[in-house]
Amino acid sequence: MSRAVIIRLALIGLIVMVSGCSLAPPKGFPTADDVDLDRFMGNWYVIAHIPPSKTKNAYNEIERYTRGDDADTINVKFTYREGGFDGQQKTMRPWATVLDDPSNALWAMHFYYVLRLQYVISYVSPDYDTTIIARDKKDFVWIMARTPKLDDATYQSLVDRVKDIGYDTSELRKVPQQPLSERDDL
């Protein structure tokens, strides 16, 4: 067997092994108590994040959730502009599976049919206007809202929640968001 084949097989094995790991957060990790999935559906503007490297220079980031064909599947459309408001629009279409029926706060986000990542709704406001999506590895976090801009007090309260989860909030990046009237990507 050639070295390239061995490396490919090892990578496939690693992906399968990682995607099969438990996605449940450890006991005590903050999760929203009872997420009403129908109310959670719709557009969420990413206000701030500790992003994956792919979106570290994103503008106008939006996650759109819609219910899938079965009760536990969520269709996701993630869009952003690369490098500026006039940058190339990028779109990703992962899907999510709801893993915990009682709270609906733990999802597995599926990418490319082989990769599953933990997605924890750690907080959603009572009016479903703001949310925090976290991971117990504390590698990524998203502060999102139903509008592209938050007032300073609301934003700071969400940053404080992120800090309480255990994240280094100095790593948060505010995502530039244009007013809705200036956008052509909705």
Model regions and ranges:
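Bacterial N-terminal signal peptides
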Residues: 9-19
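Bacterial N-terminal signal peptides that target proteins for export
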Residues: 1-10
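A beta-rich soluble binding module of mature secreted/lumenal proteins
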Residues: 21-186
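Intrinsically disordered, low-complexity segments enriched in Ser/Pro/Gly/Ala and basic residues
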Residues: 1, 18-21
